[in-house]
Each structure stands twice: as C-alpha cells, then as structure tokens.
Amino acid sequence: MRALFYKDGKLFTDNNFLNPVSDNNPAYEVLQHVKIPTHLTDVVVYGQTWEEALTRLIFVGSDSKGRRQYFYGKMHVQNRNAKRDRIFVRVYNVMKRINCFINKNIKKSSTDSNYQLAVFMLMETMFFIRFGKMKYLKENETVGLLTLKNKHIEISPDKIVIKFVGKDKVSHEFVVHKSNRLYKPLLKLTDDSSPEEFLFNKLSERKVYECIKQFGIRIKDLRTYGVNYTFLYNFWTNVKSISPLPSPKKLIALTIKQTAEVVGHTPSISKRAYMATTILEMVKDKNFLDVVSKTTFDEFLSIVVDHVKSSTDG
C-alpha cells in the first residue's frame, strides 16, 4: 500500500503537499467512509479501495503528544477482537501446565537455565511484564523482563522492589513481599555485587521462545491474558467491595483505569490494544453483577471463560 499525505481533505504523494493525487484515486472513496479527527497532524492515508480498507490499516496520524495513532478497517478490528478472545481462552487452558513447569523447576538447588526459566515464568504470570528484547535495550534503553539487571532489584528484609523504565519511558514498580512465593527465588538470583549483570544471565530470547512454545502460546499472549485477568480480578473485587455500586459503565471505566495502573499503560491502550471485547460486553449486563456478587473469583473466572469460549466457538 502506498502512503499518501493528507491535508484539508486532499491527498498528496509528497509530504510537502506539492503533488496532488488524482481525483479518481480509490483512496478518495475511502475518505468518504471515514472521518479523520481534526486534532491529528502528519496524517498518512493508505492508497487502497474501500473493500481492501475494511481489513487493513486505513490511516495514521499524530496526536497532541506526538504519539502515532493507527486506525483500521471494521473487519480488521473484528478479527483482532476475535483473536484476543481466542488468546484469552488458550492461555487459560494452559495455565495449569505452566504452573506445573514453574513448581517443578523452581525447587532446584542450582540456578541453571531451567531454574531461571521457572522464575521468569513466575514473574511473567504474576506481573505480565513486557518481554524485553535486547535490541530495544540497545536502541532506546527500554527494559523488559528478560533485560532486567541486578540494579533494578531493591532488597529489604520484608520485601523486594523491582523498578525499571519500560516502553514509552513509563516507570514500573512491582513489590514482592516476603510472604510471596517469588521472594526467595528472586533473592537467590539477585547479585548485588554485579549491578550491571542481567538477572536472567543464563537465558536468551531463543531459550524463552523454546520454553513458551511447549505450551502452544506466544510470550506476548501471556500479557494479553494478563491484562484481561487483571481486569476481571479488579472487576470482581470492586463488585464485592463497593457499596452502592456505580452504573456498569462507570464500574467498567474504574476497573480499566485500575488495570492500566497495574500493567503500566494508559486506560485507552488497555481497552483498545489488550481487552477482549466479549468480556467487556459480558460485564456490561446489570443482571450479571448479581452473579458476580455470589461467586468466588475462581468460579467467576470459569464462568467468563466458558462464555468467551462459547462466543469463539459460535
């Protein structure tokens, strides 16, 4: 697809707006079907027919903070939402196997690669931190789980604090209390005398990918699952603890905000980029709140998974 530059309803082949696109270009048909927000700047529209645009990226623009915003066709969004539903169910179905792997290897006396993989997976399934590719650390000093260093771990007698700066320069902080099962394994891995050494110094991207492959999922699937799991836990907790309950709309907005704070991004990104829409539609139902109030979290999670699964099967 060719990138065309947009200004005042017109398209150009160059970003200086000197060479206008022909009026019969199919991209103009696309513009008749979409509304480009007026606050966006540096807008690029992709040359394609309206039929093609339904399943593809349509245009990109910068918001007031300079962040690039991406707008996709309706069918692309529907397919993406359905994919999130499938990922949520798929990861839920393998969590027992993942926990078995963790339990088996975290008991090792040595800190070999399998032990480190167990600690890595335990941290990922607790905090759902971004993977942390080495190239991003080198390019812009973005830290993720794999690229954590000893200097990012602060140890005290009753807790461990994990602090680092991740994607988009967002500061992250996770607390591991002494009573948590992660405390001792993390303490065992950390070497205060080598602050610049990687925490997972016996792992590589390849080793982590090979490990996660045995469960039939991708490492990024755990984060998608984690955002939805965290949302559901917060939603369940809010229904149980807030009195009187706000409207479903306000309750969902509050829960998305809480979830975004935990996983380290904005509420809009949580909703747009990670949330399974089937889950959001399900919790909008006022009658469903009565069900939530009478269940344990595990029962609630099982009900949600069954509903999402039936939606994807249908």
Curated annotation (Swiss-Prot):
A GO MF term: DNA binding
Q: Does the keyword Cell membrane apply?
A: no
Q: According to its UniProt record, where is this protein located?
A: Virion
Q: EC annotation?
A: 5.6.2.1
Catalytically driven reaction(s): ATP-independent breakage of single-stranded DNA, followed by passage and rejoining
Q: What induces it?
A: Expressed in the late phase of the viral replicative cycle.
Active-site residues (renumbered) = 274
Main location per the UniProt record: virion
One family name in Pfam for this protein: Topoisom_I
Domain named Topo IB-type catalytic is located at 77-314
Q: Which UniProt keywords apply?
A: DNA-binding, Isomerase, Late protein, Topoisomerase, Virion
- Keyword Isomerase recorded: yes
Q: What top-level class of enzyme does the UniProt entry assign?
A: isomerase
User: Which purpose does this protein serve, as stated in its record?
Assistant: Releases the supercoiling and torsional tension of DNA introduced during the DNA replication and transcription by transiently cleaving and rejoining one strand of the DNA duplex. Introduces a single-strand break via transesterification at the specific target site 5'-[CT]CCTTp site in duplex DNA. The scissile phosphodiester is attacked by the catalytic tyrosine of the enzyme, resulting in the formation of a DNA-(3'-phosphotyrosyl)-enzyme intermediate and the expulsion of a 5'-OH DNA strand. The free DNA strand then undergoes passage around the unbroken strand thus removing DNA supercoils.
GO term, biological process aspect, one: DNA topological change
Q: Where is this site: Involved in religation?
A: 168
Which family is this sequence assigned to? Belongs to the type IB topoisomerase family.
Organism whose genome encodes this protein = Variola virus (isolate Human/India/Ind3/1967) (VARV)
Q: Name one GO cellular component term.
A: virion component
Protein name per Swiss-Prot or TrEMBL: DNA topoisomerase 1
